[in-house]
């Protein structure tokens, strides 16, 4: 049987660009699949808002995200990308998070460079960890991977706080740390990300 990570990588290769549609629950996932989408996304805000009626302010736990993920992956065969916020702790916790996501048949995750008490990416006054700490998060995620095809994406919120040059500088470091892909948060124009 083909792993979810391999399905996600194939979807990226076959669809340039790949539109990854948001699905906050199994029903939305099934509707997205029926509509012909090739991959799904569950955001941290989606878990906080749809499952708990809470804002996206680092309130949800690994178990909350894993449960919502399992419900979606059991309802559809589409590869699922999950927002794991800052990874739910230090290096050992990040490694555990990756193992839990793989066990839930998740295809990919993105981990971000905000401080642990993060804010929704579209909100002002975000604080970021330094590049070294974020690189360590990525390395812990890569080390926790038990399926080499599992896709690890690094998200940076640096555009809002450091501008495009700062975001690009961080992205270079994150790829060097082992990230398979990048997510530039809150960039408002496709012309800005043509690099």
Task: Please place each PLM-identified region on the residue numbering.
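Glycine-rich tight-turn/loop motif centered on a GG-T
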Residues: 48-65, 114-134, 164
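N-terminal glycine-rich anion-binding loops that anchor highly charged ligand groups
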Residues: 30-49
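Conserved, mostly hydrophobic/aromatic
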Residues: 25, 32, 83, 105, ...
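Catalytic beta/alpha-barrel core
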Residues: 180-190
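N-terminal amphipathic alpha-helix/helix-capping segment at the start of soluble metabolic enzymes
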Residues: 1-22, 31-34, 139-143
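Hydrophobic faces of well-ordered beta-strands that scaffold small-molecule active sites
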Residues: 19-22, 40-42, 80-84, 109-111, ...
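Active-site mouth loops of central-metabolism enzymes
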Residues: 12-27, 58-59, 82-93, 127-129, ...
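Conserved small/polar residues in nucleotide/adenosyl-binding loops
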Residues: 193-195
């Amino acid at each position: 049987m083909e792993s979810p990570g391999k399905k996600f990588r194939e979807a990226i290769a076959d669809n340039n660009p790949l539109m990854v549609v948001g699905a906050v629950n199994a029903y939305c996932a099934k509707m997205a699949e029926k509509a012909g989408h090739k991959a799904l996304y569950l955001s941290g805000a989606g878990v906080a808002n749809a499952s708990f009626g809470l804002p996206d302010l680092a309130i949800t736990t690994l178990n909350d995200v894993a449960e919502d993920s399992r419900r979606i992956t059991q309802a559809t065969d589409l590869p699922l990308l999950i927002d794991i916020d800052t990874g739910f702790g230090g290096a050992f916790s990040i490694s555990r998070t990756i193992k839990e996501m793989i066990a839930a048949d998740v295809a990919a995750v993105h981990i971000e460079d905000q401080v642990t008490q993060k804010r929704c990416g579209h909100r002002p006054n975000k604080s970021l960890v330094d590049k070294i700490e974020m690189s360590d998060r990525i390395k812990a995620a890569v080390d926790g991977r038990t399926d080499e095809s599992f896709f690890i994406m690094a998200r940076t919120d640096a555009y809002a706080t450091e501008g495009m040059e700062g975001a690009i500088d961080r992205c270079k470091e994150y790829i060097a740390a082992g990230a398979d892909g990048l997510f530039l948060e809150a960039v408002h124009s496709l012309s800005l990300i043509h690099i």
